UniProtKB/Swiss-Prot annotation:
Pfam families for this protein: ArgJ
An annotated Gene Ontology molecular function: glutamate N-acetyltransferase activity
Organism: Prochlorococcus marinus (strain NATL2A)
Chief location: cytoplasm
Amino-acid biosynthesis in keyword set: yes
The enzyme's E.C. designation: 2.3.1.35, 2.3.1.1
Site residues, Cleavage: 203-204
Protein name: Arginine biosynthesis bifunctional protein ArgJ
Cross-referenced InterPro entries: Arg_biosynth_ArgJ (IPR002813), ArgJ-like_dom_sf (IPR016117), ArgJ_beta_C (IPR042195)
Amino acid sequence: MKNALLNLSLLTSSVWSPISGGITAPDGFLAAGISAGLKPSGKKDLALLYAPDGACCSGTFTQSVTRAYCVDLCIDRIKASEGKIRAVVINSGHANACTGSRGKIDSEMITHKLAQLLRLSSEEVLICSTGVIGEAIPVEKVNSHLDQLINSLDKEAYLDAANAILTTDLQVKQIAYQAVLGGRRISIGGMAKGSGMIHPSMATMLSYLTCDVGVDHVLWSDMIKRVAESSFNSITVDGDTSTNDTFLAFASGAELDPRYLSILEEGLHLTAQHLAKSIARDGEGANCLLEIKVEGASSDLDARAIARTIASSSLVKTAVHGSDPNWGRIIAALGRAGTSFNLNDVKLWIGPYEIFSNGTPLDFDRQIVSNFMKARLTGKYLIDDLISIRLRIGIGTGSATAWGCDLSDQYVRINADYTT
């Protein structure tokens, strides 16, 4: 497991700067991550995020009809409490999806026990689960370790928590940013997990943001929906949507001058996009981060549909893995995205190289482009491992970016052996 910070120097803005501290960088949050014996490996598998003074919570969730009960519990409790949530417990190794009535009972037993220990109401506690579908949570193991989990709560335990939520991930996914707004230092933290079964619809895998700003629940919910669209809903690894996809965001602190809310949202987008790209790059068996940029579409919605269609194309992804500048596969994916455009207006670049223009391929050196791709496939994680594909499809104002990864034979091996 690689715990190094992820190329923070490349992710800056005019206002927001990367800092250490992960999910607990903002004031008002503590975290913990321990081993409760849920994983045969003995690795950390139980995490807790806690806001002692309370927080405003909003989230987006999987649209799967076969979603796990923990997703319904989160949705119901956020709605019933108008976002007043103080804790979320996360177990890895057991998805607790498709486990019948037991899934509901187990989720409620764990949150009830945790609420008692923290002296909260059950409605203030959420639960998220990740792991093998059909496997129930070992409730006795979890509940017998809740005291240890609570005693491990600490401002410095952000890496413990980020490790405890992982399953097949090879990389820890955590980040924090800070800005000074109106003379006040504001921090945003995040952590996530995800490596396979990633093609979210309204959410993604398990992802968490924290912020030390007080925000109205309705306003916060609107922000988080927009953040999800520009980040977690813009990535794909394998085209599969999980039963447990959850993105939760917590805000706790003094209210911010409304003049700075747009800058706050910029920071939320920045943080979520870093986590989203980390997930896409850590796709099972992946060797590079694939970025699809679409410009000139009639709307952002059309551009997003095109970008995600190309990013999720198995033929495009395998061509990238083979360092093959096969523009035909990209154009074919463009054509089935369900949007209108004139092929004679289309221009295509792989990295800095223009490959296709005004409806016809250009005379380019395939070996040079292939070597460019090959170098990125052996690049350092989230530093020089980006292969960018850019399309201009017209003169419209619509644009969007999606992220994915190459598709290798290792992905097949990992998933063929997943439960065996």
